[in-house]
């Protein structure tokens, strides 16, 4: 995997510029017409694929790594899971907690690095999700290892990120950020994109076995997202411990 170059402090796997970027947008997390519109649009697809793969979430302990404002966390809690969401952007967590109070959905939000949580709660979660997060940290392989450590034996770990190739640069950066303006400019750095083969290798090294992949595609004419077999740009990967 390629890695970002900035970290807030030695030993902390975080790019402070990324934290500040999402903190600045925190108040708009739950506005479906904001910069987070794509996340609202793809969330039913992500949740559906998780349930299709791992089965019912009812009563299961679930960890959402890089939860942001809680879009996926809340939907998994509504599906019956006992959800913990972690993120290092305090402003995003504040919005997540506030929205949880307003919606009556219970999620335990914590500002803690996933590596630190892995030492506190190893093998405690039936399902771990790490969506649209790996491309925003200096050492994605470290996050993969921590996610693996947090999962119970037989537990599921789900990742989603961006492939690294000319098409993904054209679609995810030029198209999404500059032409269609689906995302703010500077949301992504091409050097931080991760090929499926790289993610699969990191997963196996961490004791996870990849079990499936799906691509996510956007139709600019219908403005609809869908899951597909095309993993050339956005993709999801399921793994099992």
From Swiss-Prot:
It catalyses: a 3-demethylubiquinol + S-adenosyl-L-methionine = a ubiquinol + S-adenosyl-L-homocysteine + H(+); a 3-(all-trans-polyprenyl)benzene-1,2-diol + S-adenosyl-L-methionine = a 2-methoxy-6-(all-trans-polyprenyl)phenol + S-adenosyl-L-homocysteine + H(+). S-adenosyl-L-methionine binds at residues 46, 66, 87, 131. The keyword Transferase applies. InterPro entries: SAM-dependent_MTases_sf, UbiG_MeTrfase. CDD domains: AdoMet_MTases. The keyword Transmembrane helix does not apply. GO terms for biological process: methylation. One of its GO terms (molecular function) is 3-demethylubiquinol 3-O-methyltransferase activity. Pathway: Cofactor biosynthesis; ubiquinone biosynthesis. Keywords: Methyltransferase, S-adenosyl-L-methionine, Transferase, Ubiquinone biosynthesis. It holds the Pfam family Methyltransf_23. It comes from the Bacteria. Its EC number is 2.1.1.222, 2.1.1.64. It is an enzyme of class 2 (transferase). HAMAP family: UbiG. O-methyltransferase that catalyzes the 2 O-methylation steps in the ubiquinone biosynthetic pathway. Belongs to the methyltransferase superfamily. UbiG/COQ3 family. NCBIfam families: UbiG. This is Ubiquinone biosynthesis O-methyltransferase. The lineage of its organism: Bacteria, Pseudomonadati, Pseudomonadota, Betaproteobacteria, Burkholderiales. The gene is ubiG.
